[in-house]
Structures are given as C-alpha cells and as structure tokens.
C-alpha cells in the first residue's frame, strides 16, 4: 500500500458510468475525467515553518470531490490511485 507524506492524500477514483441513461456505451475519449473518489490513506499533515504540524481535515473512508486535473496517477497492484495535496480537495460528500 502507498503511504502519503506530509499534506498528501491517496484517493481511489470513482469511475464514471460506462453507458448513458439511454444505453449508449461511451468510449474512453467520450467519458469525462472523474473528480470524485474515496480517500484510502492520509499523510501526517502540513508542516509549518515553526515546526508545528497542521492536522488533515479529511480521513480515510471520506468520499471527496477534488480539482479536475489535480494530483498524479499511480498504478499499484492492478489498481489506479491518485496522489494529491489536501488543498486540492474541494469538498467531502456526506
């Protein structure tokens, strides 16, 4: 498993639907890039100049929405994860 460093989080992306409501199958080029996912790991938090650490606002298991082109995709054990900074998370889905 990947362990994020600092203020980074690891997200398992939620894939977009492969077919439309009317039953049309979408090709990879027609699908929009997903910007939702579930947090699978959280770093220790951002380190400030005075040496204190800011506790992350998100936790493992949170469903989140993040900026469209944020982060770096990493493939591990046949799974694709997204490593991004906590600041790139826009909202937690309740």
Curated annotation (Swiss-Prot):
Cited PROSITE patterns: CHAPERONINS_CPN10 (PS00681)
Cellular component, GO annotation: cytoplasm
Top-level taxon of the source organism: Bacteria
Protein name: Co-chaperonin GroES
Induction text: By heat shock.
Classification via InterPro entries: Chaperonin_GroES, Chaperonin_GroES_sf, Chaprnonin_Cpn10_CS, GroES-like_sf
Species annotation: Staphylococcus aureus
Oligomer status and interactors: Heptamer of 7 subunits arranged in a ring. Interacts with the chaperonin GroEL.
Gene symbol of the encoding locus: groES
Function per UniProt: Together with the chaperonin GroEL, plays an essential role in assisting protein folding. The GroEL-GroES system forms a nano-cage that allows encapsulation of the non-native substrate proteins and provides a physical environment optimized to promote and accelerate protein folding. GroES binds to the apical surface of the GroEL ring, thereby capping the opening of the GroEL channel.
Main location: cytoplasm
Single GO MF annotation: unfolded protein binding
Biological process annotations from GO: chaperone cofactor-dependent protein refolding
Pfam families: Cpn10
Keyword Cytoplasm: yes
UniProt keyword list: Chaperone, Cytoplasm, Stress response
Keyword Cytoplasm appears in the UniProt entry: yes
Family per similarity comment: Belongs to the GroES chaperonin family.
Coiled-coil spans in chain: none
Localization terms from the record: Cytoplasm
């Amino acid at each position: 498993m990947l362990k994020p460093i600092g203020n980074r989080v690891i997200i398992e992306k939620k894939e977009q639907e492969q077919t439309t409501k009317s039953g049309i199958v979408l090709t990879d080029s027609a699908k929009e890039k997903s910007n939702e996912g579930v947090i699978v790991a959280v770093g220790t938090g951002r380190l400030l100049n005075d040496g204190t650490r800011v506790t992350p606002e998100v936790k493992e298991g949170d469903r989140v929405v993040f900026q469209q082109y944020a982060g770096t995709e990493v493939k591990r054990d046949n799974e694709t994860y997204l490593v991004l900074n906590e600041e790139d998370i826009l909202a937690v889905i309740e």
